[in-house]
UniProtKB/Swiss-Prot annotation:
Main location: membrane
Residue ranges annotated as Cytoplasmic topological domain: 160-297
Residues listed as glycosylation sites in the UniProt record: 74
PROSITE patterns: TNFR_NGFR_1, TNFR_NGFR_2
GO cellular component terms attached to this protein's record: plasma membrane
InterPro entries per record: TNFR/NGFR_Cys_rich_reg, TNFR_27, TNFRSF27_N, TNR19/27/EDAR
Record-annotated membrane-spanning stretches: 139-159
Its biological purpose: Receptor for EDA isoform A2, but not for EDA isoform A1. Mediates the activation of the NF-kappa-B and JNK pathways. Activation seems to be mediated by binding to TRAF3 and TRAF6.
Superkingdom of this protein's organism: Eukaryota
Name this protein carries in UniProt: Tumor necrosis factor receptor superfamily member 27
Length: 297
């Protein structure tokens, strides 16, 4: 024959009742219908309880928060949790037989007035809601309107200031660009003469020779002769003055620096008229023959 739901087969083939465990304990494995002969008692796992003797397993504890109720007693291994009344703004429906549901549901405007708990909670909510006096409401509205007006006015003034600022800078930039274009156009139409574009080297050389003129070496009797070239005629950018076709040759003393400046100066305009001039080197000095003409008596 077959064993019952609380029996197992022993080693002699007989049906034996499963072991019973006390409160807070359960069998380590299911026992019944001929199986579970080697099961033993063990403690209930967390969130489960067993309040009586038997071979049945531990049961799950109830969670009061899930059913919207206040928890009065916590769950233990030997007892279930105890839930109290419904949470605020919740109520339990009453069945036809007078029994109430375990779960609480929210209170709404459609809740029957017979539910005392909902009526009490709604009255508490209405009592807790503060009423604002009409004068204070008017004052709040006025202050809010003024704040909005001031904010809009500030934004408008800021926008106008930014617009004027950008326009001023744009006009100034356009005027500067126009003047630069006009100057470039004038320079392209009226180029600067090459004679005015002097280099720094030529300017320095001219300054040197203008401040330190060369004195020609002439005989005393020749320097006093009328019609002969004087010292002013030799104050040039080189050791020689401009040559003229009606002058005769006469030696003038020049240094090597004078010849170097004379050969490299671009502003000297009489370089091509030297023609038959000759340079003689005697010792540590150089002599240049410059033609000049002695006027006839």
């Amino acid at each position: 024959m077959d064993c019952q739901e609380n029996e197992y087969w022993d080693q002699w083939g007989r049906c034996v009742t499963c072991q019973r465990c006390g409160p807070g304990q359960e069998l380590s494995k299911d026992c019944g219908y001929g199986e579970g002969g080697d099961a033993y008692c063990t403690a209930c796992p967390p969130r489960r309880y067993k309040s009586s003797w038997g071979h049945h397993r531990c049961q799950s504890c109830i969670t009061c928060a899930v059913i919207n109720r206040v928890q009065k007693v916590n769950c233990t291994a030997t007892s279930n949790a105890v839930c109290g009344d419904c949470l605020p703004r919740f109520y339990r429906k009453t069945r036809i037989g007078g029994l109430q549901d375990q779960e609480c549901i929210p209170c709404t405007k459609q809740t029957p007035t017979s539910e005392v708990q909902c009526a009490f909670q709604l009255s508490l909510v209405e009592a807790d809601t503060p009423t604002v006096p009409p004068q204070e409401a008017t004052l709040v509205a006025l202050v809010s309107s003024l704040l909005v007006v001031f904010t809009l006015a500030f934004l408008g003034l800021f926008f106008l200031y930014c617009k004027q600022f950008f326009n001023r800078h744009c006009q100034r930039g356009g005027l500067l660009q126009f003047e630069a274009d006009k100057t470039a156009k004038e320079e392209s139409l009226f180029p600067v003469p090459p004679s005015k574009e002097t280099s720094a080297e030529s300017q320095v050389s001219e300054n040197i020779f203008q401040t330190q003129p060369l004195n020609p070496i002439l005989e005393d009797d020749c320097s006093s002769t009328s019609g002969f070239p004087t010292q002013e005629s030799f104050t040039m950018a080189s050791c020689t003055s401009e040559s003229h076709s009606h002058w005769v040759h006469s030696p003038i003393e020049c240094t090597e620096l004078d010849l170097q400046k004379f050969s490299s100066s671009a502003s000297y305009t009489g370089a091509e008229t030297l023609g038959g001039n000759t340079v003689e080197s005697t010792g540590d000095r150089l002599e240049l023959n410059v033609p000049f003409e002695v006027p006839s008596p």
